[in-house]
From Swiss-Prot:
Top-tier EC class: transferase
Protein name (Swiss-Prot/TrEMBL): DNA-directed RNA polymerase subunit beta
Role according to the record: DNA-dependent RNA polymerase catalyzes the transcription of DNA into RNA using the four ribonucleoside triphosphates as substrates.
Any Gene Ontology CC annotation: DNA-directed RNA polymerase complex
NCBIfam families in the cross-refs: PRK00405.1, rpoB
Enzyme Commission numbers on file: 2.7.7.6
Keyword field: DNA-directed RNA polymerase, Nucleotidyltransferase, Transcription, Transferase
Record note on quaternary structure: The RNAP catalytic core consists of 2 alpha, 1 beta, 1 beta' and 1 omega subunit. When a sigma factor is associated with the core the holoenzyme is formed, which can initiate transcription.
Lineage: Bacteria, Pseudomonadati, Pseudomonadota, Gammaproteobacteria, Thiotrichales
Gene: rpoB
InterPro entries found in the cross-reference section: DNA-dir_RNA_pol_bsu_ext_1_sf (IPR042107), DNA-dir_RNA_pol_bsu_external_1 (IPR019462), DNA-dir_RNA_pol_su2 (IPR015712), DNA-dir_RNAP_su2_dom (IPR007120), DNA-dir_RNAP_su2_hyb_sf (IPR037033), RNA_pol_bsu_bac (IPR010243), RNA_pol_bsu_CS (IPR007121), RNA_pol_bsu_protrusion (IPR007644)
MF annotations from Gene Ontology: DNA binding; DNA-directed RNA polymerase activity; ribonucleoside binding
Length: 1358
């Protein structure tokens, strides 16, 4: 087994038993693949069914009303973005690119005859069709400078669905749902009548739709019912027994007798195959029935007197005595009737026809028109056009390929081609037939929560739909323009207005429910947000109406949606996370991977199955035991089939799970010993990992699951090597790799990776990248070169490993509180950097422009000490609450001045009184260091000194970067040819004769550009030098071009909002240490608040004097059933012990052979998966041992982790008791505790619920306008609510004066509080109470009811 660069430095011991079959697919592919499909830029790869192409093809050609112009679509191109991703974030711009569409305008001769079209002219050009947002490499969008994610939506798939309502009668209904267009419903009522609805409007008979499709009453009956022939004569009535086999299973309503009057089959019996044979053998072809039975029947076809052409009876008329007499009169002794005798099937449609008052297609169309457009007078043309537009015109109605596939599959017919996306007559007939079958018990209703009936709509599809909406508006505009614009040579640009497209797309990205501000607490929260699947949003469910069934875990979720990770609040079950191996297929259905089983042998062939396919197979679990030939060991094994867990013979198994973790999401797969935790707690654990705050220094978890490196790799926060090569240069800002062109598929000699430094995330945490490679290191493609935030050697590291003791300590861990050691604070383990952004905007007001300046009236010099001459704070300044960050003045209205004031103003030239200080100040409760300042201003007034200074710094930095990049390229080019050219014969060189030998000394005097001008006699060498020369010159041109482009983007003027003159952004880094009140958690849902930070000397300690870091309450475990944390603590202790063992060996010797023995015992004495230490050289072994001193990292994959025996064996090797308990001593007294305590290493996280963000106090502040009471909440600088129950408490104590103060001056007594403030200033301690404002509000409300109520103050005066 080979190890990557980062893995060699720290190998994780893995405990999994199951073989590794399939790598976890790229975690962000659901985002990137979907948008790539929408935005197929490369026309050569075929854009036939890509998003943009198909929308444009469907929308064009557009024809003018008079038919003279036709606009055709030819092709499209997506241009280059104006700014790159980083610049867009800095400038608050959108990362997008212009869409240019090639349109062809065909002009026809207007004098031609009506039916002929003569082309007069064809004009083609590219037309700008708005800007399309581009996706970043990490699957996000930058909209107005902020990073956003478009969450995928799980919605009901297009197709037909049959359901049964929850009422007592249990009425059945069918619904045809298109991808876009009107919904069509059919439903039974309690009487068995079939009704139809279009778009949930008023219901009408289902047969009206059939008549509107052109079916006659006779054809409808023929389609939906059987007919039987009755013969009649003077003896009575007889029913012909045709199609006896169709009658099997039906209840007989009469005796069947043979010619001798022997009863063959009795009445009220269900007919069997044996009965049918008996009847045939007896030669019975008809049976006598009485008139009572005949009178319940109806005519199947119109009865016409052939002699006169007169209609005696219409189809569906009742059979009556008068009808029979009329038939006898014209000599008809046979009657074709609807078969109600042997089956009830035909009665539903027959009864519906009785209710249906329409007689033909025209009347049916009018009836539908009246339902959809009540009040509109129906005109013949509009009636037909409306009905056809509902279901039969593709621009208005589309089932899409998914809907057509589902409809054909559900109706079990392929009569309709899969390329037809509108409804056909046979579809509607088929749906009604299937509905009748379900009512008759011959079919099943659909399970709407089955993942075969719900599909994922990803970002590409949503943007495609928005684009279609915008293009539809553009299309209407084009038609109008064609008829309005009168120009000699009309061009496509003249008639296309692209604003509706831009508006539709902008609306979706800025205010759409599924376009969300990216959750960026840490890399895991980013990945999880991008893999989120929501059932909410437009066209989805609403959380108020969603019932329990929709939210519940369904059998088809297995391997597709995680059954664990979902929010805890009102959205529970509506927002899900994609399972780790799941993918979305071309139809939008979720698929899970399985290993194929052939003839009882499990192969390594992987097949992805959707929920629909999976129902038909028997699937074994990943943990099923196999022998060395991959055959099942046991004869009877546990499997899944059709959503049920079953035990079955191994010969019946068709597929097997790929991995034990395939049913859970990425976040849940990070929880070790997940299988030992209660599901509710795991849910909390998975959700809380997303809230972990990245700390100053990341530390890998000692006990992990092996999923850490996958999440870190796919999050995009680490820098990954693109090619094989050697590290040429490393500093904190960049890594330069000299590429090995022989092993890499690239012609680049150099790869340069720029690192992100101290960038603010969406959640105000600090994004910073640190290199982990050294100069001279050899790297492979895919190796981690630099760690991002919350990663350690390419592994996700959200918290720290702490030594935990499960014991009470003086009540400080009551109710999940956490007792922390002061060592944790001292070592800055949970210290985090938060970057806050403060913005100051100078606007043009009615009274004049606001100004950012250091010249501010009535402000002391000390307050301006941290500002530069432009009035903006210096970078590096330490700022406290109330400090000025940006000094700004705003003009205020001129006041009438007295002559004296005017004189003083003139003498002192004082203009201070007509401006007001509106500076940006540091908010209360915060302090930090200014790390960056950005200034954006319009060019109209010229740039300020600070803006020019920032601009110059950026240009100098860019120049330096590009110069360094070029220097590296030069050195790489030099080293690639130097050895070969020294000692070679010269063909031509300045200063040397032909045939001379080139020396190293001569080369040292020349710059590289002169080297490359030398030509050599050796042709092969000459060719190599020629290639190097070309590469060097191309690189020089490319770097100069890149610098010019960068310089242009830096100096380019900023587009500010209207009325804004200047915007200044100040970034302040705030350091937050852990303190009492902060929330912490483990990975098993074990959360708590820090109650006290205890000095190290007072903490309980072990026999060797090592103090523990944390005391947790043991009572928090039994009731919560998250035992995984105990197992994690035991395994963590073992890991720590193994680290100590390696450290002791290192202290004794640094010989690789001895260290290998220790590592062999540590890694390979326990567990099935061995570590190949032979793959590491001696130097790498030493580095590995140095990195393992703090503990040997262990991976225990979910559902396939370490067993109890493994943990005990490791504890023994690590030198601890196998029960994981030990004697602890009280730090205060030195005495041992009565009982042994469970001690171990647990991975603890600091969550983004910091006490600093919640602490808040107010003395005076803003008040509510109506009630005049103080506002609530920290954001409004509000006060503490003194509620009803608090009032009762004061009443109970009889604290009358305190109560009066609370309800008046401290709340809404306006006059009283002003007086009180004045009294405090004057040093008086009296309190005058007035009428509280809420009484005035009450009085006004009573007056609104017409009652004049007022307060009577007279008694007080008397």
């Amino acid at each position: 087994m080979s190890y990557s660069y980062a893995e060699k430095k720290r190998i994780r011991k893995e405990f999994g038993v199951l073989p590794h079959i399939l790598d976890v697919p790229y975690l962000l592919s659901i985002q990137t693949e979907s948008y790539k499909k929408f935005l197929t830029v490369d026309a050569a790869k075929g854009r036939l069914h890509s998003g943009l192409e198909i929308v444009l093809k469907q929308s064009f050609p557009v024809e003018s009303k008079n038919g003279q112009y036709e606009l055709h679509y030819v092709d499209y191109q997506i241009g280059e973005p104006t700014f790159d991703e980083t610049e867009c974030q800095v400038r608050g711009a959108t990362y997008d690119a212009p869409l240019n569409v090639k349109l062809r305008l065909v002009v026809y001769n207007k004098d031609a005859l009506p039916n002929e079209k003569i082309v007069e002219d064809i004009r083609e050009e590219y037309v700008y069709m708005g800007d399309i947002p581009l996706m970043t490499t990490n699957g996000t969008f930058i909209i107005n400078g902020t990073e956003r994610v478009v969450v995928s939506q799980l919605h009901r798939s297009p197709g037909v669905f049959f359901s049964k309502d929850d009422s007592e009668e249990g009425a059945f209904s069918a619904r045809i749902i298109p991808y876009r267009g009107s919904w069509l419903d059919f439903e039974f009522d309690s009487k068995g009548i079939i009704w139809a609805r279009i778009d949930r409007k008023r219901k009408f008979c289902a047969t009206v739709i059939l008549k509107a499709l052109g079916y006659t009453q006779e054809q409808i009956l023929e389609n939906f019912s059987e007919s039987k022939t009755i013969t009649f004569n003077s003896k009575g009535f007889a029913l012909r027994l045709d199609n006896l086999s169709n009658m099997k299973g039906e209840l007989l309503k009469f005796d069947i007798v043979d010619a001798q009057d022997n009863v063959i089959v009795k009445k009220n019996k269900k007919l069997t195959s044996r009965d049918v044979k008996k009847i045939k053998d007896a030669g019975v072809d008809s049976v006598a029935i009485d008139f009572d039975l005949v009178s319940t029947l109806r005519v199947a076809k119109d009865i016409v007197n052939e002699a006169t052409g007169e209609v005696i009876a219409y189809a569906n008329d009742d059979v009556t005595e008068s009808l029979l007499e009329s038939c006898v009169e014209v000599g008809m002794l046979e009657l074709e009737v609807i078969d109600f005798i042997t089956t009830e099937r035909g009665r539903y449609i027959s009864d519906t026809l009785k209710y249906d008052l329409t007689r033909n297609t025209d009347e049916a169309l009018v009836e539908i028109y009246k339902v959809l457009r009540p009040g509109d007078p129906p005109a013949a043309a509009s009636v037909k056009a409306l009905f056809e537009g509902l279901f039969f015109i593709e621009s208005r109605y589309s089932l899409s390929d998914i809907g057509r596939m589902k409809l054909n599959a559900r109706l079990g017919s392929d009569k309709v081609s899969k390329d037809i996306y509108t409804l056909e007559n046979s579809d509607i007939v088929g749906v009604i037939e299937e509905l009748i079958n379900i009512r008759d018990g011959k079919g099943k209703v659909d399970d709407i929560d089955h993942l075969g009936n719900r599909r994922v709509r990803s970002v590409g599809e949503m943007v495609e739909n928005q684009f279609r909406i915008g293009l539809y508006r553009v299309e209407k505009g084009i038609r109008e323009s064609m008829s309005l614009v009168h120009k000699d040579k009309l061009m496509p640009k003249d008639i296309v207005n692209s604003k509706p497209i831009t508006a539709a797309i902008k609306e979706f990205f800025t205010s759409g429910a599924l376009s969300q501000f990216m959750d960026q607490d840490n890399p895991l929260s980013e990945v999880t947000h991008k893999r989120r699947i929501s059932a909410l949003g437009p066209g989805g469910l609403s959380r108020d109406r969603a019932g329990f069934e929709v939210r519940d875990v369904h059998a088809t979720h297995y391997g597709r949606l995680c059954p664990i990770e979902t929010p805890e609040g009102p959205n529970i079950g509506l927002i899900n996370s994609l399972a780790s191996y799941a993918r979305v297929n071309d139809y939008g259905f979720l698929e899970a991977p399985y290993r194929k089983v052939v003839d009882g042998k499990v192969t390594d062939e992987i097949e992805y199955l959707s929920a629909i396919d999976e129902d038909n197979y028997v699937i074994a679990q990943a943990s099923t035991k196999l022998d060395e030939n991959n055959h099942f060991v046991e004869d009877i094994i546990q499997c899944r089939s059709g959503g049920e867990a079953i035990f079955t013979e191994s010969s019946r198994v068709q597929y097997m799970d790929v991995s034990a973790k395939q049913m859970v999401s990425a976040a849940a797969a990070l929880i070790p010993f997940l299988e030992h935790d209660d599901a509710n707690r795991v849910l909390m654990g998975a959700n809380m990992q997303r809230q972990a705050v990245p700390t100053l220094k990341s530390e890998k978890p000692l006990v992990g699951t092996g999923m850490e490196k996958i999440v870190a790799r796919d999050s995009g926060n680490c820098i990954i090597a693109r090619n094989v090569g050697e590290v040429a240069e490393v500093d904190s800002n960049r890594i330069v790799i000299k590429v090995d062109t022989e092993k890499s598929q690239t012609s680049n000699l150099v790869d340069i990776y720029s690192l992100t430094k101290f960038k603010r995330s969406n959640k105000n945490t600090c994004i910073n990248q640190r290199p982990i490679v050294n100069v001279g290191d050899k790297v492979e493609a895919g190796d981690i070169l630099a760690d991002g935030f919350a990663t350690d050697f390419g592994e996700l590291s959200l918290g720290h490993n702490l030594m935990v003791a499960f014991m009470p300590w003086n009540g400080y861990n009551f109710e999940d509180s956490i007792l922390l050691s002061e060592r944790i604070v001292k070592d800055d383990k949970y210290t985090s950097i938060h970057i806050e952004e403060f913005t100051c905007v100078a606007r043009d007001t009615k009274l004049g422009p606001e100004e950012i300046t250091a010249d501010i009236p009535n402000v002391s010099e000390s307050s301006l000490a941290k500002l530069d001459e432009s009035g903006i704070v210096h970078i590096g300044a330490n700022v406290e609450a109330g400090d000025i960050l940006v000094a700004k003045i705003t003009p205020k209205a001129e006041q009438q001045l007295t002559p004296e004031e005017r004189l003083l103003r003139a003498i002192f030239n004082e203009k201070a009184s007509n401006v007001v200080d509106s500076s940006l100040r540091m908010p209360s409760g915060t302090s930090g260091t200014v790390i960056n300042v950005q200034v954006f201003e319009n060019d109209k007034g010229g740039k300020s000194k600070r803006a020019l200074k920032i601009e110059k710094e950026l240009i100098d930095k860019a120049r330096k970067d590009f110069d360094e990049e070029f220097a590296v390229i030069e050195s790489v080019v030099k080293s690639s040819i130097e050895q070969e050219v020294v000692g070679a014969k010269i063909q031509k060189a300045k200063g040397l004769k032909k045939g001379a030998i080139l020396t190293k000394e001569f080369l040292a005097t020349l710059p590289l550009s002169k080297w490359l001008e030398i030509s050599f006699e050796d042709e092969k060498l000459e060719e190599k030098v020629q290639n190097a020369r070309e590469y060097y010159e191309e690189a020089k041109i490319a770097i100069d071009a890149k610098f010019e482009a960068k310089k242009k983007s830096i100096t380019q003027s900023n587009e500010l909002s209207p009325g804004v003159l200047k915007t200044v952004k100040v970034f302040v880094a705030i350091k937050k240490r852990i303190q009492p009140g902060d929330k912490m958690a483990g990975r098993h849902g074990n959360k708590g608040v820090v109650s006290r930070v205890l000095p190290v000397e007072d903490m309980p300690y072990m026999e060797d004097g090592t103090p523990v870091d944390v005391c947790l309450n043991p009572l928090g475990i039994p009731s919560r059933m998250n035992i995984g944390q105990i197992l994690e603590a035991h395994l963590g202790l073992a890991s720590y012990g193994l680290g100590k063992k390696i450290e002791k060996t290192l202290e004794k010797t640094r010989k690789a052979a001895e260290l290998r023995k220790t590592l062999e015992e540590v890694y390979n004495s326990v567990g099935d998966k061995k570590v190949n230490l032979e793959a590491l050289n001696d130097e790498e072994i030493l580095t590995l041992c140095d990195n393992l001193k703090g503990g040997v990292p262990i991976a225990t994959p979910v559902f396939d982790g370490a067993k109890e025996e493994d943990i005990k064996s490791l504890l023994k090797i690590g030198g601890f008791a196998t029960n994981g308990q030990m004697k602890l001593f009280d730090g205060r007294t030195g005495k041992p505790f009565d009982r042994h305590v469970t001690v171990g290493y647990m991975y603890m996280l600091k969550l983004d619920h910091l006490v600093d963000d919640k602490m808040h106090a107010r003395s005076t502040g803003s008040y509510s306008l109506v009630t005049q009471q103080p506002l609530g909440g920290k954001a409004q600088f509000g006060g503490q609510r003194f509620g009803e129950m608090e009032v009762w408490a004061l009443q109970a104590y009889g604290a009358a004066y305190t109560l009066r103060e609370m309800l008046t001056v401290k709340s809404d007594d306006i006059a009283g509080r002003s007086k009180m403030y004045k009294n405090i200033v004057d040093g008086k301690l009296t309190m005058n109470v007035d009428v509280p404002e809420s009484f005035n509000v009450l009085r006004n409300e009573v007056r609104a009811l017409g009652i004049d109520m007022d307060f009577d103050y007279s008694s007080e005066e008397e």
